[in-house]
Curated annotation (Swiss-Prot):
The gene is SPH23. PANTHER family: PTHR31232, S-PROTEIN HOMOLOG-RELATED. The keyword Nucleotide-binding does not apply. The lineage of its organism: Eukaryota, Viridiplantae, Streptophyta, Embryophyta, Tracheophyta. It is found in: Secreted. This is S-protein homolog 23.
Length: 122
């Protein structure tokens, strides 16, 4: 019985990971600049975290059945983290949208996005 419980828990974790959406924030800044990150939705808060140069942070989450899942993020860098940008880091567009992984890269000249679909379409 204990083995069955463990198997069920592992199965739910794997299925949740496979079917979930997510955000990836990567630090591609130069000159050893650290990246401060904080993201939030209606129900969750991620961070604040410090991402080292060349580092990244993955956050996977399930979307709601009403297709209203949205995450907002703030990234800060520079002396005393004075330079900052607020943006919508994840948003569903319809009930049939699974979201995929929104891959953000912070660079010296801006913040760049690549959306990776979960169904093998890039």
């Amino acid at each position: 019985m204990q083995n069955l419980s463990i198997l069920l828990v592992c199965s739910f974790c794997i299925l949740g990971h496979v079917s979930s959406a997510g955000i990836r924030i990567g630090n591609e800044l130069k000159n050893k600049k650290l990246l401060w990150m904080r993201c939030y939705s209606k129900d969750d808060v991620i961070g604040p975290l410090i991402i080292p140069i060349g580092g990244h942070r993955f956050n996977y989450f399930g979307t709601n059945i009403f297709a209203t899942t949205r995450f907002m993020c703030t990234l800060r860098q520079g002396p005393n983290y004075r330079h900052h940008q607020n943006f919508t880091a994840f948003k569903l567009y319809s009930a049939s949208d699974d979201g995929g992984v929104w891959d953000w890269r912070a660079r010296e000249d801006g913040i760049y996005l690549k959306i990776k679909a979960e169904r093998g379409v890039n």
